[in-house]
């Protein structure tokens, strides 16, 4: 209390005089002042942690929650654990973009022949070009729907083929598969798994599979979980860069999706399947 009195009245009286009257040592007063202004080691660590976490969270475009941020920071040399990163996010009021409830799309009969389910929900692949998976989703713009077809290599979860169109046709699926074939140097005997949509059952798509010696596989009727890996990618795409945004044209949506696939998802977005690496990093590490 004496030191508090001195602090309040130091503009009126000299420190020396007040210390003499109150019978306290001037050295004690100065030590007390230093202790009040000194930041503890723990406080310094928290401030440093908060600044580093904020920077990483911003770089991730607010997409990473604590586990992925921890992997990102460890790769940069910061030995933070998940609890520390989670606490920092909580204290700063930072929240990754929230997911939405998954609503499976209903199956529509089309009367076309379907392929046998060769995958049977076994999404593991020991190397590249053993198992691919594809699907189509729809994206809303002010101009109308934009349809996106993708092909994913289940080994690394990399998007190796994609195509976008204002119409959901067999050509959309064929174009995505053609890009995958071009990127992967046209491998043979790959299992290519899709749902039973009319685009994948079409004569054009089936002919493309046969022409390149690919093995077609299709999900069970109405079972979206047979193609869970592609559904998971679409979920990440929509949560991380589409939900909450307003797209006035298909062209803007197209550019956004292209940037997400080619610049973000494949190159640097950390994937739990890849041990915290991005699909591109995983492939480079395992093919070196």
Curated annotation (Swiss-Prot):
Pfam assignment, any one: rve
Domain of life: Bacteria
InterPro entries: HTH-like_dom, Integrase_cat-core, RNaseH-like_sf, RNaseH_sf, Transpos_IS3, Transposase_IS3/IS150/IS904
Keyword vocabulary terms for this entry: DNA recombination, DNA-binding, Plasmid, Transposable element, Transposition
One GO term of the biological process aspect: transposition
Its job: Involved in the transposition of the insertion sequence IS3.
Record-given protein name: Transposase InsF for insertion sequence IS3fB
Species: Escherichia coli (strain K12)
């Amino acid at each position: 209390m004496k030191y508090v009195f001195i602090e309040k009245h130091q503009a009126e009286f000299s420190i020396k005089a007040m210390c003499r009257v109150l019978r306290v040592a001037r050295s004690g007063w100065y030590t007390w002042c230093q202790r009040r202004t000194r930041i503890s080691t723990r406080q310094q660590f928290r401030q440093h942690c908060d600044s580093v976490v904020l920077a990483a969270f911003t770089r991730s475009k607010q997409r990473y929650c604590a586990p992925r941020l921890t992997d990102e920071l460890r790769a940069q040399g910061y030995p933070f654990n998940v609890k520390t990163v989670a606490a920092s996010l909580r204290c700063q009021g930072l929240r990754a973009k929230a997911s939405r409830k998954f609503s499976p799309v209903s199956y529509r009969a089309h009367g076309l022949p379907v392929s046998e389910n060769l995958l049977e929900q076994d999404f593991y692949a020991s190397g590249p070009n053993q198992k691919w998976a594809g699907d189509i989703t729809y994206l809303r713009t002010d101009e109308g729907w934009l349809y996106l077809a993708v092909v994913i290599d289940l080994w690394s979860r990399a998007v190796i083929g994609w195509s976008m169109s204002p119409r959901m046709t067999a050509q959309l699926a064929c174009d995505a598969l053609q890009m995958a074939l071009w990127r992967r140097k046209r491998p043979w005997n790959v299992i290519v798994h899709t749902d039973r949509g009319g685009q994948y059952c079409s004569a054009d798509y089936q002919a493309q599979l046969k022409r390149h010696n690919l093995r077609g596989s299709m999900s069970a009727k109405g079972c979206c979980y047979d193609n869970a890996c592609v559904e998971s990618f679409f979920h990440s795409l929509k949560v991380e860069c589409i939900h909450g945004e307003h797209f006035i044209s298909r062209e803007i949506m197209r550019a956004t999706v292209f940037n997400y696939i080619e610049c973000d998802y494949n190159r640097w977005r950390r994937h739990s399947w890849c041990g915290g690496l991005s699909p591109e990093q995983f492939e480079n590490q395992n093919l070196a």
